[in-house]
Structures are given as structure tokens and as C-alpha cells.
């Protein structure tokens, strides 16, 4: 079972890797495709994968149900591989965006099918931990991308790669994703299909073999429970999501997804090296912006783990409130630094890490838990799709417009970064109000939550 969880969780690592690897290459991509004076198209190029993510998350459900979780994951692995090799080796702008879009389809689909597969194949006693491990690997993938970018840049700069080299450093950064993508795709041939899907296809004997292989203690009871669950799903009264009685869960999902993205996390993850270079104080042992990005990624990883361990102890509201205060202070200090035009020592790096840490233990750790909890069974799948789509749409939008905002002086004589991080700080303050308004769901059954939120 641990092997299956490891293989499936590589999908999460690829999810995070694909999201962050572009950060180290974005300045060179801008120059390579002549987008230096075209911030609109530079932002669009960066957001292409996220546009694919929206579509991938929307369309993956039916293929996963018709052809199985395992085959769907194999297709996702192939898409990751094609995207990494294609976008890294191509020198045509349109083809580059097409390959990045294919990678985005894989990210969106894996965000749905990966956790689904792990949840369906894991023994009940380990299910929560293995699903959480997938989420953890997303953040680990971000760190791996930053580390990969740093070593590739360091190697090529140290060895003085010629301008007419086969591939430029930024291309190697993107191609590097092909290694975990190939490993993921090949290893998927060593793991079984989801037993829940097999039972839904009347392939009970195969499902029984899978349960035996993963160490399920009471195979017959588990299979009976799945059959009963499938029967209940067929008989659940399906309802429209968008009606008055569901307005509070809808509003909660919309607000937490919106605050999650508009607090500025993608601006940090996608543009970290460029942002850190703007401080003008890259000196000393950690002078390389790529290395500073690694520090940011490790901070994200550490505090994501902390948030996951505290979410059922302190509760959703408390974590969001604590994180909101930290984000307000950190983003406010970044805005102040840009306003004064000075960042002493590693002030910007410290502030960015403080923001990322605050985000990771709050909005980062709680978003998917809250969205999964607030909707009743009759509309839960639709509600989760709505919350997920809200998240991805804002993610793509922010990534797209960030280069435009950075290059637009809204107030004469004032750095655009002052306005941008001032805005992020205001959004963080609104997160504090959201935490005050949000009903606490810690320690409550889904039925209790439904009674509190749904007004017939």
C-alpha cells in the first residue's frame, strides 16, 4: 500500500513542479519570445498552463469514470511528459503555449483524479494520511522545481554555456520536469486499478484481489460498503447547486477561493526570482534569487506541514485568523519597503517568507477542507467543482495580469509594487473578517454542518 501511495503521490509532486518550474524561466521566456515590451502577452504566456488547468479539472470526471482512474493517471503522466519536452525544446511562441496548455490539462486533471484514486484504494485506517500525503507532495514539488532551477542555472553559469548551445538554461529548467514525469508514467504500470471503480464496473473479483494486495482486513465488509454507497449515490436526489438555500455554502466556497488567490500567493510562486531581484540587496551567501526562491519554497513546505497538523486541533477559523494577521504585516512591510525604496539586508526575503508561512498555515491549509465540508451530499460534487473553478480562474487571472500591474505606474512617482502589495495586504485584512464570519466546522459531522448552513 505504501508503494501505491508513493506512486500515486508522484502525481501531486508533478502538479507542484509544473506550477513552480516556470518561475525560474519566466524572464528568459520573456526575452526569448520578444515579450519584453508586451506585458499583456507575457502574462498570458505565463497563465497558459493555468487556463489548461481550469479545463482539465472540468473535463476529467467523465473519462475517469468511463475508462478508470489508473488509465486516466497514465494519460496525465504522458501529458506531463509531452508538455515538459515540447515546451522546453521548442523555439516557437505559439507551440510553446500549446505545450504549456497541455501541461495545464494534466495539472487540473491530477488535482481531481489523484486524490480520488488514493482515497478509493487506501484502507480506511490510512485514507486520510495518504490523501494528505498527495497534498503535501504538491508543495514538495514546488520546492523540487525551485531546487532544480537553482542547480541548472548554477551549472550553466559556472560552465559558461555558449549562446548557440543546444538548449538554453531556461529550456533545461522546463525539460527537467520530464524526469519525474517519465518516472510517474512508468511506475503507474506497477499499481492496480481503483477497487471502487472496478466494483462500479461489475468487476468484483478484480476488486477483491486489489483489496487483498493492499492489506484490507475485512475485504467482504469493505466491498459491501462500496456497493451500498454506489447504490445510495444512484438514489440520492440530485439538486441544482445555485438556489437560495445553498447560498451560504456557495458564498463560503467563493470567498475562501478568492481570498486564497487574491492574497498574492501566485505572484510569489510564479515571479519569486524577479520579485527578489527588485530589492537590490542580493549580496552575501544567499545572493542568488534562485537560491532565495528555494528558501521561500522550503518555508512553504514547512508551514504547510504545520498547518495540516493543526487544522483539527485549532480549527479552521483560528488558523485563518492567525495567518491573516501575519499576511497583513508581511505584505504591508513589503509595500513599505518598495515605497521607501530600501530593503536593508535580507528584509524582503524575510517578509516574503513570513507571508508564505502565514499563507501556508491558513488559507493554504484550509481551502480544500472547507470547500469539501460545507456542501451537502446532494450538491457536494458540484459545489467542489465550483470552488475549484473559482480558485483556478483567479489563479490564472492573477498570473496573467501581474506583469501588467508591475509595469504600470498607477500613481506618479510611486513604484507599482507599492500598490500591488498594498492591495494584497488589504485582501489579507479581509481574510481576518472572513475568519470571524466563517462558521467553525472542527469536530462536527457533515450532517451537523449541513443543518447549520442549509436553510430550507
For each predicted feature, which ranges?
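Alpha-helical transmembrane bundle of multi-pass membrane proteins
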Residues: 1-203, 211, 231-456
Amino acid at each position: 500500500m505504501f508503494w501505491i501511495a508513493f506512486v500515486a503521490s508522484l502525481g501531486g509532486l508533478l502538479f507542484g513542479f509544473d506550477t513552480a518550474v516556470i518561475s525560474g524561466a519566466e524572464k528568459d521566456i520573456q526575452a526569448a519570445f520578444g515579450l519584453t515590451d508586451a506585458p499583456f502577452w507575457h502574462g498570458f504566456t505565463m497563465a497558459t498552463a493555468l487556463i489548461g488547468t481550469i479545463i482539465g479539472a472540468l473535463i476529467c470526471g467523465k473519462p475517469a469514470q468511463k475508462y478508470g482512474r489508473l488509465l486516466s493517471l497514465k494519460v496525465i503522466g504522458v501529458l506531463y511528459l509531452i508538455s515538459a519536452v515540447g515546451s522546453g525544446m521548442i523555439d516557437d511562441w505559439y507551440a510553446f503555449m500549446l505545450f504549456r496548455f497541455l501541461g495545464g490539462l494534466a495539472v487540473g486533471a491530477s488535482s481531481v483524479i489523484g486524490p480520488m484514486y488514493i482515497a478509493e484504494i487506501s484502507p480506511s485506517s490510512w485514507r486520510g494520511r495518504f490523501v494528505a500525503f498527495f497534498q503535501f507532495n504538491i508543495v514538495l514539488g514546488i520546492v523540487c522545481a525551485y531546487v532544480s532551477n537553482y542547480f541548472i542555472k548554477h551549472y550553466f553559469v559556472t560552465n559558461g554555456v555558449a549562446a548557440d548551445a543546444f538548449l538554453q538554461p531556461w529550456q533545461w529548467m522546463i525539460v527537467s520536469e520530464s524526469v519525474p514525469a517519465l518516472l510517474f508514467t512508468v511506475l503507474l504500470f506497477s499499481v492496480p486499478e481503483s477497487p471502487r471503480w472496478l466494483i462500479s464496473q461489475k468487476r468484483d473479483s478484480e476488486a477483491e484481489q486489489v483489496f487483498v494486495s493492499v492489506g484490507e482486513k475485512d475485504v467482504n465488509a469493505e466491498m459491501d460498503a462500496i456497493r451500498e454507497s454506489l447504490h445510495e449515490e444512484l438514489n440520492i436526489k440530485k439538486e441544482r447547486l445555485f438556489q437560495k438555500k445553498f447560498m451560504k455554502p456557495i458564498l463560503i466556497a467563493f470567498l475562501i477561493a478568492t481570498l486564497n488567490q487574491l492574497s498574492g500567493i501566485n505572484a510569489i510562486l510564479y515571479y519569486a526570482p524577479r520579485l527578489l531581484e527588485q530589492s537590490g540587496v542580493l549580496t552575501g551567501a544567499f545572493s542568488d534569487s534562485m537560491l532565495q526562491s528555494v528558501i521561500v519554497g522550503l518555508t512553504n513546505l514547512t508551514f504547510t506541514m504545520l498547518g495540516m497538523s493543526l487544522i483539527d486541533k485549532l480549527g479552521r477559523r483560528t488558523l485563518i485568523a492567525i495567518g491573516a494577521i501575519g499576511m497583513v504585516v508581511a505584505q504591508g512591510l513589503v509595500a513599505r519597503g518598495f515605497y521607501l525604496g530600501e530593503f536593508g539586508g535580507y528584509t524582503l526575503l524575510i517578509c516574503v517568507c513570513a507571508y508564505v508561512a502565514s499563507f501556508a498555515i491558513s488559507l493554504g491549509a484550509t481551502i480544500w477542507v472547507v470547500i469539501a465540508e460545507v456542501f451537502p451530499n446532494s450538491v457536494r460534487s458540484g459545489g467542489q467543482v465550483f470552488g475549484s473553478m473559482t480558485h483556478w480562474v483567479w489563479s490564472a487571472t492573477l498570473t496573467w495580469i501581474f506583469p501588467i500591474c508591475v509595469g504600470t505606474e498607477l500613481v506618479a512617482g510611486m513604484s507599482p509594487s507599492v500598490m500591488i502589495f498594498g492591495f494584497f495586504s488589504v485582501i489579507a485584512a479581509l481574510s481576518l473578517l472572513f475568519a470571524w464570519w466563517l462558521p467553525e466546522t472542527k469536530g462536527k459531522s457533515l450532517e451537523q454542518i449541513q443543518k447549520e448552513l442549509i436553510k430550507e
